């Protein structure tokens, strides 16, 4: 309808294919206007595939860049639909206080005011109303399945705009009757969640307000239809996701050779760390060791995945192969950091007052709840962690003393309380031993999950000191393992090529050079 083309957004803030296409078309037009052809030279494309290569740099054209963007948009959308059970489309509601929101409200109101004045005129002017019914007819027809011929014919017959115009010319048109038919038809086609909206439409007497609300409910029904289609597609996408994503990424790689640069650096960093660790472990003082340490590709890749649990998602760019799961990994990491902090607080509390509170599981639950509530949002930049840890320490002391008093036991003295609060506050300090210990144990637990078959038959045992967060840790661990296992299935061949070059490339090159010198 006029003035009703609100932009729709994808929940989870994912880009839509249509937005990408419109952007591509507008940019292509601009490119044609400014120059006959615009091209971009990728940094990685200028690098030779081997040290001896003298091939000229590959030029990536503008069209190839935009084609890669469309492929990435399609792949991201398909991935989100398949792995996110809560994914749905929803309308983008502009804040009423914003300039855009106020402008839209004014323009909409002006349109409906004009329509009302036309219908109240003597004689009434029906042309705008007829155009609205024409648009309503097309929307209703779009909801029908191919087999709905009977209802299709009925809609076309009742909302025949040529006939309505003839009736209007003779002042015989029944606008209210047409609106009632539309509402009745909407009631047959809508999802049960819209039944209340249909009842409100039937109870509205002002014809202009009825038409206005009809379009509002039709917009909701369109979203319902799209989300129903998404739910129907999800099982099919889940079955085809691995092949689809791998094919799309291969197309992106062909159009943009630099599409694996960040991924290569991500894996290379793990290779260097593992080589350093292995060298330090195997090097004997005073002995000469000329052999190159051998690394397991699986070990290197798993350690690369573990690095994502300590990633700075605000400042550090993700590997290209993990872009589709970036938001999930960031959320998982933030929740994991909160669990680490809760486990640290519980361990300190248990070490200091565990003997006094032994056999009081309800107290442990209360202390955990206090920590979890106060640590909510701890990953935000504005969060004052030291102050919150101090507050948690004070609250813990209050709860422990309250429990001890209820059982007629002596409360914690001031020295113990100060010591407890002080240890809590020191957790945020760099290289804190308690934090390092808990972090290492959680890393070991997550690493053990990556070695299990998918799906795992049973969960591995939780390391000591983590029992207080066992349930939450197992849940996050399963989410993490599912993300990693799906990512391995999709991008395994690309990782294999990168690992082959990083782990065996120099050796292969050396053999080739030795062979050529012998000949």
Curated annotation (Swiss-Prot):
Record carries keyword Transcription: no
Modification Phosphoserine occurs at: 16
Protein localization: Cytoplasm, Cytoskeleton
Predominant location category: cytoplasm
GO terms (BP aspect): muscle cell migration; signal transduction
Protein purpose: Promotes the migration of muscle-derived satellite cells (MDSCs) during differentiation throught interaction with FMNL2 and therefore may participate in microfilament assembly.
Subunit structure: Interacts with FMNL2; this interaction promotes muscle-derived satellite cell (MDSC) migration and differentiation.
Designated name of the protein: T-complex protein 11-like protein 2
